[in-house]
Amino acid sequence: MSVVEIEEGVFESTATIDNGSFGTRTIRFETGRLARQAAGAVVAYLDDETMLLSATTASKQPKEHFDFFPLTIDVEERMYAAGRIPGSFFRREGRPSTDAILTCRLIDRPLRPTFISGLRNEIQVVVTVLSLDPKDLYDVLAINAASASTQISGIPFNGPVGGVRVALIDGQWVAFPTVEQLEKAVFDMVVAGRKVGDAGNEDVAIMMVEAEATDKVIELVAGGAGAPTEAVVAEGLEAAKPFIAALCDAQAALAGAAGKETAEYPVFPDYAEDVYYSVASVATDALSEALTIAGKEARDDRTNEIKAEVVERLAEQYAGREKEIGAAYRSLTKKLVRQRILTDHFRIDGRGVTDIRALSAEVAVIPRAHGSALFERGETQIMGVTTLDMVKMAQQIDSLGPETSKRYMHHYNFPPYSTGETGRVGSPKRREIGHGALAERALMPVLPSVEEFPYAIRQVSEALSSNGSTSMGSVCASTLSLLNAGVPLKAPVAGIAMGLVSDDVEVEGGGVERRFVTLTDILGAEDAFGDMDFKCAGTKDFVTALQLDTKLDGIPSQVLAGALAQAKDARITILEVMAEAIDEPDEMSPYAPRITTIKVPVDKIGEVIGPKGKMINSITEETGASISIEDDGTVFVGASNGEAAQAAIDKINAIANPQLPKVGERFLGTVVKTTDFGAFVSLLPGRDGLVHISKLGRGKRINKVEDVAKVGDKLRVEIADIDNRGKISLVLVAEEEAGAATPEAPAPADAATSSS
């Protein structure tokens, strides 16, 4: 991979992505022109019009009192990148959009484990979107830009990291697909990794995967496309590796030409070896026994007791090093948990490696909610709640992404009491936003279209108790809740979290073998102590969403394929339990709005709305219905009961699809305007007639219209004449005839106006 010095001190490297018949994409990395005071700054281009600036900086001094690595990733969306002014009140960018937050997480997950262990200097990576072609998504380019700026910064970093989006389109995995190409994809995933191995024997270690079936997958599969099964997903991961390698090569070449020498940064190990050996000698036996306790609360109580005893016993020997004792104790716990899994194939709570904890599912748990459910898996408990409303309540999105509105909104809440702790409550943290987005993507492929189900849907997942994969529990609870709300899902979806433990294990004869053990339905501790966190959601037939993070330098393809197959077995088991609670959509809640869809001619939309919304507002006030109109003439009418909705529909149809009144027809109309020469009476929505002043006195002369007719009065009238311009002349019906008319025998058009 060659590097070009395009001017003095400005270097550029390029990665070319060849998608065959789908075209070629070019990713360029440039450094030396912008943000020169940052430790490392790189401008990344996707083709010619999408441009990001990534700047990496480090604090001068370490935060010695921190017991974690203080890495911060920020993504700044500038609306000028798309030639737009922000829609906020102050017309400037404010808090990051959901897209920006999710991109921060995409960058953080593969970058964080790539820094050297024990680093305590604050590291900040800021990615700014400077220009964006509407056909492109910027998130994957941001991963590469962040890695490249960090790689040249002189900070100890075991990169570079390459990131690519691959989409399955017409049977081919296409890298860096455009928004238009994604419309034809059945599956798309973001894969990040780095090159490992010696020259000539190199491979790509996959570090992070974020994948989903598209919302058109069922339609495309029905049309002959291949379903995104576990085997297909595994093929996609392999297909991503050459693209990642090319991106890593381009970054490495740039760093070779323009990168700084790696600086010396102080490293703070969690503990010294002497502390670990002392802790191990004191605690191993008691801790090994405690880790066989099945219940989380009892197990935690016992391990905390042992920890307190160890700290007390070693406090004098290691005065002032209590943090090291705690870290060493955690490391010993991790070693014992992993050892038992690898050698005995037993886990902390006594389960085998493929066992799922006890499952339960229940629907209709909240009285007035439109739909609700409770899903439990062991000590993880999730409540799902569904709310239905008019389509106009869809979320409006003001960001750089192609999405401008969102009809299905999935919100995830993780209160501190779910883990028995205290903490801050309020606006969602990045983790909550990420978990909600994952559950949302898992369900999108099975949601009905707006034509099939004309509602905006808000799904809320409440993590009431947590001990392992609340995000996948949210998928299960949401499926149950949506069905309880009457949403006609195309198929039920369930999710499961998988784990992986690997290490060199001594075997008989004195040899050593590398052993991989995949765990089904991991606990929180197994997530923390394992080598992989792998969440997989789907129907009984295919995968709808997948998220993978690993700490290993590569997972053998057969191990990953086995984990996918193991996840499917668990998913089928969970779906069976869910089907016992509810297996088809329930009747809609009496508290949910009834929404009807009708079509009106596009050229009649203005008449239905009326000047300054006068007509549509009057229909809403008279009937109590809620009305929204789309640009294509689709009208959504929602009301708490069918009668109100039908009354509104009748009024809309009378305007948009009118039946012209005829001479001789009688109406009970409402006076809407008075003038010196008569009173205008509303007969049908949008159609008025005039009773001349000479006809208002019933044979008597009157001087002022308001003496006999005021705005709002009801008058029974008959059409006397319709001129060639459509203007209607009315006369009053004789009093004796009006009195003889009964509700059972209304005038011809009375039925359409009786709600006036």
Curated annotation (Swiss-Prot):
GO biological process terms on file: mRNA catabolic process; RNA processing
Cofactor or coenzyme needed: Mg(2+)
Reaction(s) catalysed by this chain's protein: RNA(n+1) + phosphate = RNA(n) + a ribonucleoside 5'-diphosphate
Gene Ontology CC terms, in alphabetical order: cytosol
Top EC class for this record: transferase
Family matches, as Gene3D superfamilies: GHMP Kinase, N-terminal domain (3.30.230.70), K Homology domain, type 1 (3.30.1370.10), Nucleic acid-binding proteins (2.40.50.140)
EC number: 2.7.7.8
GO MF entries: 3'-5'-RNA exonuclease activity; magnesium ion binding; polyribonucleotide nucleotidyltransferase activity; RNA binding
UniProt keyword terms in alphabetical order: Cytoplasm, Magnesium, Metal-binding, Nucleotidyltransferase, RNA-binding, Transferase
Ranges of residues in domain KH: 593-652
Localisation per UniProt entry: Cytoplasm
Residues annotated to bind Mg(2+): 527, 533
The keyword tRNA-binding is annotated on this UniProt entry: no
Residues in the signal sequence: none
Primary location class: cytoplasm
Domain S1 motif: 664-733
HAMAP family associated with the record: PNPase
Function: Involved in mRNA degradation. Catalyzes the phosphorolysis of single-stranded polyribonucleotides processively in the 3'- to 5'-direction.
Record-linked PANTHER family: POLYRIBONUCLEOTIDE NUCLEOTIDYLTRANSFERASE, POLYRIBONUCLEOTIDE NUCLEOTIDYLTRANSFERASE 1, MITOCHONDRIAL
Family: Belongs to the polyribonucleotide nucleotidyltransferase family.
Protein name from the UniProt record: Polyribonucleotide nucleotidyltransferase
Protein species of origin: Mycolicibacterium gilvum (strain PYR-GCK) (Mycobacterium gilvum (strain PYR-GCK))
Gene that specifies this protein: pnp
